[in-house]
């Protein structure tokens, strides 16, 4: 079997009107991932609805409601090949109420392409654009490129492109901690395909790469094999003649038969007998592998979903409390000390209490706006101290980022998201 190309997850972010979905649709079409007949059909459908020019976007906007409104709601995943990678595109929604999807989407991204409208040079940077870039930075995405879209509306003017490039660099990227000098800016007209997959003849002044070439230049994610073993449990089975078989995805480190392991917060200790993936035994498993494994000395009743496996020499951290940086996405009123919503981190769902609201931050820059505020509302970013109501494994993002991020849910919606910056470990 031919070795498949490495997979690279790329998030497309930016304001709702910048043309993200059209850019993605064009990449998929010119990259050979979509049947051109589909575009012809969608173009007809778009014109009938008075949305001419939306045909590429329709490829990503799979949901019917999105087509009617022309808005991307859920996180859509599509693939296309470049010279180097099999690229999975995470098309992140642009609307305020959909930032929670952005958080679940961006956390899977290895790199991001920010799509901006060249016209923003006149109207200023959209708040949503700031928020998206801040969020991907917060979520640990370090590789970024900028597609300056709708160049056809300014006759492919180099001056307009340079003006926007300077504004995005000075007023956005530098403030958030990206170095504009190290970021590729690409002038594109996604609807017509200029500089998306193919070089444009209409930008003779631009000598740089196309969007597809920029994506090829991103670095593949390093598998965190050098970090301590962490494997959140998704399910536990008891198989006759085999014994207890937990299943889950290796987040960090390496697991192999013979390893002495501990499940936290359960405290159960055992030894790995076999490791399997897709019904085949493996000599070892690494980050990204979804595995089942047989463990000696641990019964089905001893462990459950939400427990995290690690080596006995470096057990997962059980938090008595933790300090976190959060962004409040939506809440009908305000968050105050004592609020106890459910935290979703790795496979665990555990209620945690807001013990202190230490600082309110500017969500676009991270600077401190207020010490010890009385409350937080939608749109605020903050540093807070949290106390789990039950034992829970969470790691500091500095130590093991894969186990440091969480979403906060209440009333059937994601009210906030964030990451643990300091964890007080329970005494073993």
From Swiss-Prot:
Swiss-Prot/TrEMBL catalytic activity: GTP + H2O = GDP + phosphate + H(+)
Q: Which GO terms describe its molecular function?
A: GTP binding; GTPase activity; translation elongation factor activity
Subcellular localization is given as:
Cytoplasm
Chain segments carrying region G3: 91-94
Does the keyword field hold Ribonucleoprotein? no
Domain (tr-type G): residue spans on this chain: 5-225
Stretch list, region G5: 189-191
Question: EC top class, in one word?
Answer: hydrolase
Kindly give the SUPFAM superfamilies that the UniProt entry links to this protein: EF-Tu/eEF-1alpha/eIF2-gamma C-terminal domain (SSF50465), P-loop containing nucleoside triphosphate hydrolases (SSF52540), Translation proteins (SSF50447)
**What is the designated name of this protein?**
Elongation factor 1-alpha
What is the originating organism of this protein?
Methanococcus vannielii (strain ATCC 35089 / DSM 1224 / JCM 13029 / OCM 148 / SB)
